[in-house]
Amino acid sequence: MPAAALQRRPWVPAASEDHVLSIAADAAARDAASVAVEIERLVAENHRIHDVDGLNLNPATNVMNPAAEALLSRGLGSRPSLGYPGDKYEMGLEAIERIEVVAAELAAEVFGAKFAEVRVSSGALSNLYVFMATCRPGDTIIVPPPSIGGHVTHHAAGAAGLYGLKPVSAPVDADGYTVDVAALAKLAGEVKPKLITIGGSLNLFPHPVPAIREIADGVGAKLLFDAAHLSGMVAGKAWPQPLEQGAHAITMSTYKSLGGPAGGLIVSNDAALMERIDAIAYPGLTANSDAGRTAALARSLLDWKVHGVAYAAAMRETAQALARALDARGLPVFVKARGFTQSHQLAVEAARWGGGQHAAKKIAQGGLLACGIGLPIAPVEGDINGLRLGVPEIVRLGFTPDDMPQLADWIARALEGDAASVAAEVRERRTHLGELRYIVR
């Protein structure tokens, strides 16, 4: 039996690497036809997990408009597209370059921007592009800490640190799940950042963007709004508009609340900043981009142009209804005194179940998919202290605020150890779902 080509990576946790090498050994032992069959089986299994047996309550994922998803397999992605529309390096790109412009125009319309960079392949790289356009290695930036959802890309282990920046965590307003403005002003005066970032992996209430912009101006810094999770809420006008409030740029993932293909997007009204970002994208780090993804993004943005206001409002109302229903079941939903949430996300204090990841694994046994998140409360040893929940996908599937007491009951019962019966009920509920909502057909 052939040995796997992959070798053990001593820097990877042993349990994970044992799992990897087991899969690799199985693949190495198969002939080509068997590997092809196995890939098809795994794709079908993923469909069962997400679309037959489960409900995604993870706000980092969504379901795409089938018309947009179909564009990913229409022969566009393997066609390199270097240069500006009207002057491409390769020939035969007359159609693809028009797709690129349509995607950028729709992004500008939806986000109220003058400029859009659609070639970025991920939200993390979108952040890196802005870091590179505003800072030099060795510069200091102020970023949201993990306790208020600050993403790793803003920190030392992520894009910021890998580029050589010195991230400093912003002071926290725990009750508002955002930054403490007065303390931020003091910190900015001390460390003189080149960039201040706001927005993260959990956003419950609007961030004080105008006040942060004033602080940034006072120290000569730029302001980046990371809308990786908030992109749909911003696009649907259910959230304050960051560019109008003073952000120099918005970065985002395009597959979370926005419900598009995997990738990134940058929008801005600052011409000088976007000129630098454009040069980073081409001929810098992006060069060729996936035109299939660009087409799928354009088709997804069209959904927001037509249905965005209704979809975003429905997400907010449904998230609030779920928070109230969980609270009524006795679950410790974070910041009850503030009304739980004004976004599509909410969080549960998870110490009772050993932490957020432990809680997520419990409800996953009931077909409810979620994950942990950091909260500005007492830590949980060996785990994250919060459970993050979101509603973008279930709202698109047709769930409404009226369904949230049932969903809260499933979550509570799964956490209490009744996952098997919950899983059966979730599977049955999925059989009654109709067509996707809030899409252009």
From Swiss-Prot:
Keyword terms: Lyase, Pyridoxal phosphate
Transmembrane portions of the chain: none
Gene Ontology BP annotations: glycine biosynthetic process from serine; tetrahydrofolate interconversion
Cofactor(s) this protein cannot do without: pyridoxal 5'-phosphate
InterPro entries from the UniProt entry: PyrdxlP-dep_Trfase, PyrdxlP-dep_Trfase_major, PyrdxlP-dep_Trfase_small, Ser_HO-MeTrfase, Ser_HO-MeTrfase-like, SHMT-like_dom
EC number: 4.1.2.-
A Gene Ontology term for the protein's cellular component: cytoplasm
One Pfam family hit: SHMT
Modified residues (N6-(pyridoxal phosphate)lysine): 256
First-tier enzyme category under EC: lyase
Catalytic activity, as annotated: 2-methyl-L-serine = formaldehyde + L-alanine
GO molecular function terms attached to this record: glycine hydroxymethyltransferase activity; lyase activity; pyridoxal phosphate binding
Segments forming a coiled coil: none
Function per UniProt: Catalyzes the reversible interconversion of alpha-methyl-L-serine to L-alanine and formaldehyde.
Assembly description: Homodimer.
Record-stated family: Belongs to the SHMT family. Alpha-methylserine aldolase subfamily.
PANTHER family linked to this entry: SERINE HYDROXYMETHYLTRANSFERASE, SERINE HYDROXYMETHYLTRANSFERASE 1
Protein name according to UniProt: Alpha-methylserine aldolase
Organism: Variovorax paradoxus
